């Protein structure tokens, strides 16, 4: 006998559909796997974001950057050079001197002897001290020469001395003196100039001298002047380069025969040759 329809419905209600339940279980398992995967990706992204935040400098933080120092590294270039020692003076150099002339000595004669002994020209720049018994040449004085007795203070002392042959007027001293009563006299020293106490003289010496006559002739403008270099290992002899001037005299200069060049009647560019001895150190 056939079952009524409600029997079938009740039977269906009590039955469990295994296919539906298994499908639901598979879907739940798949969703749980997706959830775990999403969670892992989210965790990885959060860790990456944390690392990025740690790498980025925060506000107020000091960023230290290792930079190369400017300039060359030490020892690469510009190394210290060995010092240069000059063991020989230049022949054209001037040498400064402070000369102390002792009491009772003739100032002019002492400086002239110093020039001949060292074989160097001496240029007197200044002097201080007291002198006595002075003989000066003055144009206004009777006979051109005046002798002064007593003590005088040196106001100015200048001049030059050459060790070798030289024209008149190129060597000597010019002095200005102050007397005890305040009078001032001066002129070229032509006699003794005796030192009272110590007389200090500031001078410069040189080893080369070239004689020039001015104004220069037109044909001499491009020739230049000759010069003798002293102080070498084999210095020239005195008078070796001076021409023979016999029978020629300059009326305006009253030059000795050995200083008039080549018998031409005019003075050219003539050097003075001195034997330069090495001075003691």
Curated annotation (Swiss-Prot):
Residues 67-79 bind DNA. It holds the Pfam family PCC. GO terms for molecular function: minor groove of adenine-thymine-rich DNA binding. It is found in: Nucleus. Keywords: DNA-binding, Immunity, Innate immunity, Nucleus, Plant defense, Transcription, Transcription regulation. Signal peptide: none annotated. GO terms for biological process: defense response to bacterium; innate immune response; negative regulation of defense response to bacterium; negative regulation of innate immune response; regulation of photoperiodism, flowering. Residues 43-85, 216-247 are annotated as: Disordered. Its main location: nucleus. Coiled coil: none annotated. One of its GO terms (cellular component) is nucleus. SUPFAM superfamilies: AF0104/ALDC/Ptd012-like. Residues 91-229 form the PPC domain. It comes from the Eukaryota. The PPC domain mediates interactions between AHL proteins. Overexpression of AHL20 results in a decreased expression of NHO1 and FRK1 and in an enhanced susceptibility to virulent strain DC3000. Transcription factor that specifically binds AT-rich DNA sequences related to the nuclear matrix attachment regions (MARs). Negatively regulates plant innate immunity (PTI) to pathogens through the down-regulation of the PAMP-triggered NHO1 and FRK1 expression. PANTHER family: AT-HOOK MOTIF NUCLEAR-LOCALIZED PROTEIN 15, AT-HOOK MOTIF NUCLEAR-LOCALIZED PROTEIN 20. This is AT-hook motif nuclear-localized protein 20. It comes from Arabidopsis thaliana. The lineage of its organism: Eukaryota, Viridiplantae, Streptophyta, Embryophyta, Tracheophyta.
